[in-house]
Amino acid sequence: MPQLSRYSDEHVEQLLSELLSVLEKHKAPTDLSLMVLGNMVTNLINTSVAPAQRRAIANSFARALQSSISEDNAH
C-alpha cells in the first residue's frame, strides 16, 4: 500500500517481519493467517477509532488492500 506515511520504512518492515514470524512459528496456513489478521484489523478499528469514523476507515483500508493486490499468477 504505497503512500506517504509518518512512519519510517524501517519501522514498518520491522513490525511486518515480527508479525510474519509469529504466523510462521505457529505454522499458520494462509486462510488462518488471513482470518487472524482480519480479526486484528476489526479489533483495532472497533477499539481505537471513533464510532462515527469506523465505516470510513474500514472502507479506506479495503480500497487500499484491493489496490495493493497483484494480478500475476505467482504465489
Swiss-Prot record:
InterPro entries: UPF0352, YejL_sf. Transmembrane segments: none annotated. It comes from the Bacteria. Gene3D superfamilies: YejL-like (1.10.3390.10). Belongs to the UPF0352 family. This is UPF0352 protein YejL. It comes from Salmonella newport (strain SL254).
